[in-house]
Amino acid sequence: MSCGKTHGRHENCVCDAVEKILAEQEAVEEQCPTGCYTNLLNPTIAGKDTIPFLVFDKKGGLFSTFGNVGGFVDDMQCFESIFFRVEKLCDCCATLSILRPVDVKGDTLSVCHPCDPDFFGLEKTDFCIEVDLGCFCAIQCLSPELVDRTSPHKDKKHHHNG
């Protein structure tokens, strides 16, 4: 398969990967002890129900979007993120929640590169985007340990939004 060519739904590697991620997340949420991908998510560890990932466009660029536009929720800060969690999948269209990047203090960041030196972890949000997975050529799964990563600092400026 190559980028930009029209293929059937089952020939899109990004769509297939997101479908597998969703199945694994749902298995953990349902406390399914026999998930096929338990090496990524362990159903016995409470709170680890997210496989964060990055998606790349057909030119190799990272896809990014914005959360909390207008600053109406939590710390009132709009942010840019390249990190996502799959929520729903229908054919090759997906609802992705935008994961909020945070620094070691738990403050919201705008992150356009995964190696940003201030980036420490991710928090789940209720901000979502609808995407056509056929528009992407690559996906990179990240460690579930990035989500709700424990920080040595306690004074956070916003509340967790799950």
From Swiss-Prot:
It holds the Pfam family Spore-coat_CotZ. Its main location: other. One of its GO terms (biological process) is sporulation resulting in formation of a cellular spore. The keyword Disulfide bond applies. It is found in: Spore coat. Signal peptide: none annotated. It comes from the Bacteria. Coiled coil: none annotated. InterPro entries: Spore_coat_protein_Z/Y. The keyword Disulfide bond applies. Keywords: Disulfide bond, Sporulation. To B.subtilis CotZ. Disulfide cross-linked either to itself or to CotZ. This is Spore coat protein Y. It comes from Bacillus subtilis (strain 168).
